[in-house]
From Swiss-Prot:
Effect seen on changing residue 324 to A: Complete loss of activity
Source organism of this protein record: Burkholderia plantarii
Record domain AB hydrolase-1: where: 48-327
Catalytic residues as annotated in Swiss-Prot or TrEMBL: 126 (nucleophile), 302 (charge relay system), 324 (charge relay system)
Keywords of this entry: Calcium, Disulfide bond, Hydrolase, Lipid degradation, Lipid metabolism, Metal-binding, Secreted, Signal
Binding residue positions for substrate: 56, 127
Residues that bind Ca(2+): 280, 326, 330, 334
Localization in the cell: Secreted
Protein's UniProt keywords contain Signal: yes
Gene Ontology molecular function terms on file: metal ion binding; triacylglycerol lipase activity
One CC-aspect GO term: extracellular region
Identification of the protein by name: Triacylglycerol lipase
């Protein structure tokens, strides 16, 4: 009975995960950007440009229609910030010659050439935080700060789960077929129709085992000791360049009681009869994926990334009532009644960077 219950939970989670994947978090390295809003003030006018870095399954603008960072770039611009949005492969590893890290590095250099600035402030969501860390490690002189939002620095238990499910096929055909469809999807939603997509490499990148390897290859003072569920230093100096390090994440998905070996989960971002449960399909989907993570000992999470995994540098908060997409104001600005305003949180943080002189 317990095994049957777990199987049903797993099957539903995979289905819901596939439904939400298009919205989660290619190397279109053009400098095209949305028209800058007229600045009402200089609240977010940092010394160095801000680059927003998307995560898994992302792009700068889905199918050239919907912003990944929904409403965030225009808000920052209206407060005086110079903001650029990277457009990387939606499905790819972070390291390697074709990786997202090298794509982002090329984009950083373009932004610097276009603006005359000497450094940038990187703000990455989900996998975008790992990508940002790559650039800070290999080209430290180009980076002033790294901020990660809901980033799986220690990997994602849900990525482990998906990988384990795929391994149950002895032929390996399911992995190949699913990856082919996901790669095509990545090309279609990319604003530049980027064909550099590798879904299986992206999945491996986000597993707990592979992120441990990544952290050894690209260490950062912002990381705490492995297994400690602690953050690291608020600053680091790499090659003579100092980086300010920040993070935050959502923990809307919380464990409840355990029955027959299966622990339940609740979404603290939503209230009773919350409209987000109806108008935003990712709300229930991320509750399901978060439940899978809880049953793999993740603890509280945002549906894809646990609290412990998100810790990096100076932790602004891990108490936001957000799921993984709420962190970037998705889906289309809809969020639960208890969820904080992510646009305001990011605006306040960019002001924090301004006050720090970067």
């Amino acid at each position: 009975m317990v095994r049957s219950m777990r199987s049903r939970v797993a099957a539903r989670a995979v289905a819901w995960a596939l439904a939400v994947m298009p919205l989660a978090g290619a190397a279109g390295l053009t400098m095209a950007a949305s028209p800058a809003a007229v600045a009402a003030d200089t609240y977010a006018a940092t010394r160095y440009p801000v680059i927003l870095v998307h995560g898994l399954a992302g792009t700068d603008k889905f199918a050239n229609v919907v912003d990944y960072w929904y409403g965030i770039q225009s808000d920052l611009q209206s407060h005086g910030a110079k903001v650029y949005v990277a457009n990387l492969s939606g499905f790819q590893s972070d390291d390697g010659p074709n990786g997202r890290g090298e794509q982002l590095l090329a984009y950083v250099k373009q932004v610097l050439a276009a603006t005359g600035a000497t450094k940038v402030n990187l703000i990455g969501h989900s996998q975008g935080g790992l990508t940002s860390r790559y650039v800070a490690a290999v080209a430290p002189q180009l980076v002033a700060s790294v901020t990660t939002i809901g980033t799986p620095h220690r990997g994602s238990e849900f990525a482990d789960f998906v990988q384990d499910v795929l391994k149950t096929d002895p032929t390996g055909l399911s992995s190949t077929v699913i990856a082919a469809f996901v790669n095509v999807f990545g090309t279609l939603v990319s604003s530049s129709h980027n064909t550099d997509q590798d879904a299986l490499a992206a999945l491996r990148t986000l597993t707990t085992a592979q992120t441990a390897t990544y952290n050894r290859n690209f260490p950062s003072a912002g990381l705490g000791a492995p297994g400690s569920c602690q953050t690291g230093a608020a600053t680091e100096t790499v090659g003579g360049s100092q980086h300010l390090l920040y993070s935050w994440g959502g923990t809307a998905i919380q464990p409840t009681s355990t029955v027959l070996g299966v622990t339940g989960a609740t979404d603290t971002s939503t209230g009773t009869l919350d409209v987000a449960n109806v108008t935003d399909p990712s709300t229930l989907a991320l509750l399901a994926t978060g439940a899978v993570m809880i049953n793999r000992a993740s603890g509280q999470n945002d549906g894809l990334v646990s609290r412990c995994s998100s810790l990096f540098g100076q932790v602004i908060s891990t108490s936001y009532h957000w799921n993984h997409l709420d962190e970037i104001n998705q889906l289309l600005g809809v969020r639960g009644a208890n969820a904080e305003d992510p646009v305001a949180v990011i605006r306040t943080h960019v002001n924090r960077l301004k006050l720090q002189g970067v």
